[in-house]
């Protein structure tokens, strides 16, 4: 995807480039640690980079802080993340306590990875668009949104035609093809399961897609 973005920038050079990532960098895929390592390095020279938090990063955060209270994370893709950092998951498979695994994971996550994960934002507003992982609660102004909704919301947001102050750009709920609605744009094409990754290109007068894995 980054190679395609670089090609696009050469063909259509803008004055300013901001890359916004919508979260869920870890879990389910085979190399969560590799993804975080990639995000630690500038992908596009000269571009501003905004990294948003997804609910899977939140689950990792909770697992490290309170292992026993967040064991469900392991069933939602956390096992793959543990493996990618070289954690011995035999205890997890045996149903033993989660605390030793959390302690081992904390030791094995490199400091730059921890710093990146700690720096993730829950939203970003740029021009006519509001970026977040999952969506926003209808009827609530964007500057008063609950962070939990920005990371987790589904039905109440997806089923609503509420006109927010900005167009919401989000992921979280996989769709076969990116969806464009008057109040929101969903670009989550379920890369972990489909191999399709979608990038939305926005400018003052344009909305278009760069897709890989089609």
Say what each PLM segment does:
Residues 79-87, 91-186, 190-196, 202-213:
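Acidic, His/Gly-enriched loop-helix segments that form or flank divalent-metal centers
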């Amino acid at each position: 995807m980054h190679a395609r973005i670089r090609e696009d920038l050469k063909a259509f050079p803008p004055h300013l480039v901001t890359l916004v990532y919508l979260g869920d960098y870890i879990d389910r895929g085979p190399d969560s640690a590799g993804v975080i390592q990639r995000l630690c390095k500038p992908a596009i020279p000269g571009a501003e980079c905004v990294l948003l938090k997804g609910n899977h990063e939140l689950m990792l955060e909770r697992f490290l802080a309170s292992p026993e209270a967040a064991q469900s994370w392991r069933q939602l893709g956390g096992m793959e993340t543990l493996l990618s950092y070289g954690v011995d998951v035999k205890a997890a498979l045996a149903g033993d306590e989660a605390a030793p695994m959390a302690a081992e994971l904390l030791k094995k996550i490199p400091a730059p990875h921890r710093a990146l994960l700690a720096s993730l934002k829950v939203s970003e507003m740029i021009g006519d668009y509001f970026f977040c992982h999952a969506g926003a609660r209808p009827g609530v102004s964007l500057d008063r949104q609950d962070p939990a909704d920005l990371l987790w919301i589904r039905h109440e947001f997806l089923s609503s035609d509420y006109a927010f102050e900005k167009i919401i750009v989000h992921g979280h709920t996989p769709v076969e093809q990116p969806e464009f609605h008057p109040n929101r744009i969903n670009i989550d094409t379920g890369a972990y399961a489909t191999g399709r990754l979608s990038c939305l290109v926005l400018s003052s007068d344009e909305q278009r897609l760069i897709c890989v894995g089609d």
